[in-house]
């Protein structure tokens, strides 16, 4: 398969970036998108040119690091997959593929296709956890009854990998889907009730401080999410936030 890649190159967050064109050949349909970029980088290194910087880690759709905008879509044309799970058979011989970093004020470019998504870490650190006293009086989790529907919904919310596709897909660069998933996975379980008020207030406030936009119910985030996180989580977080505001 012969392709033309048009890739965003940018030396750092303050530099002016540009699209650079790279022809590439010999690409097989069974290659992943990242393996295709590996082939390109091997060619660039052989020529003495600087390789394209992109983020990746597990390459199994778990870590959320491989966040790329491919032909204008977060993670590319396939659904419910991350970039590392996208195979080149989704493209045709002779195609031109545009590859860019995720675009958001809160995701500054580090270099080329890599962005700094530590804003998500700070939102998580603000309240995405449960405080536990482990000094000998911890109760076995299985001893606390949990409604099956709540358990299923909490598990579904917890599958969020924090890749940032929701932000990249949103016209407002909103992080509501990510934040609501992290709020929901605890709001639905008894273990999360003790800190529920402080959690939702702290996480939403941190989200706003990071410079993410607001949600206007477009729904692009749910469509592009590789884990299929539901918009229902945003509605739940709004309810949790309202309850917490009234208590405060």
Sequence positions of predicted segments:
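Short, structured protein-protein interaction patches enriched in aromatics and acidic/basic residues
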Residues: 53-65
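Functionalized membrane-embedded alpha-helices
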Residues: 62, 68-70, 221
């Amino acid at each position: 398969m012969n392709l033309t890649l048009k890739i965003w190159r940018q030396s750092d967050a303050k530099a002016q970036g540009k699209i650079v064109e790279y022809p590439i050949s010999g690409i097989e349909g069974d290659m992943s998108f990242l393996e295709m970029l590996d082939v390109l980088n091997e060619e660039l290194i052989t020529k003495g040119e600087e390789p394209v910087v992109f983020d990746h880690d597990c390459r199994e759709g778990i870590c959320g690091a491989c966040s790329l905008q491919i032909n204008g879509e977060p993670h590319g044309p396939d659904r419910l997959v991350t970039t590392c799970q996208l195979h080149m058979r989704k493209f045709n011989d002779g195609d031109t593929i545009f590859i860019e970093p995720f675009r958001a004020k809160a995701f500054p470019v580090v270099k080329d296709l890599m962005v700094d998504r530590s804003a998500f870490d700070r939102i998580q650190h603000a309240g995405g956890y449960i405080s536990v006293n482990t000094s000998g009086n911890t109760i076995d989790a299985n001893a606390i009854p949990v409604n099956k529907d709540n358990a299923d919904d909490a598990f579904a919310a917890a599958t969020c990998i924090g890749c940032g596709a929701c932000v990249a897909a949103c016209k407002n660069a909103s992080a509501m889907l990510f934040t609501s998933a992290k709020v929901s996975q605890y709001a639905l379980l008894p273990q999360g009730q003790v800190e529920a008020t402080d959690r939702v207030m702290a996480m939403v406030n941190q989200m706003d401080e990071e410079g993410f936009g607001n949600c206007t119910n477009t729904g692009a985030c749910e469509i592009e999410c590789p884990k299929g996180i539901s918009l229902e989580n945003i509605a739940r977080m709004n309810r949790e936030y309202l309850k917490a505001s009234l208590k405060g």
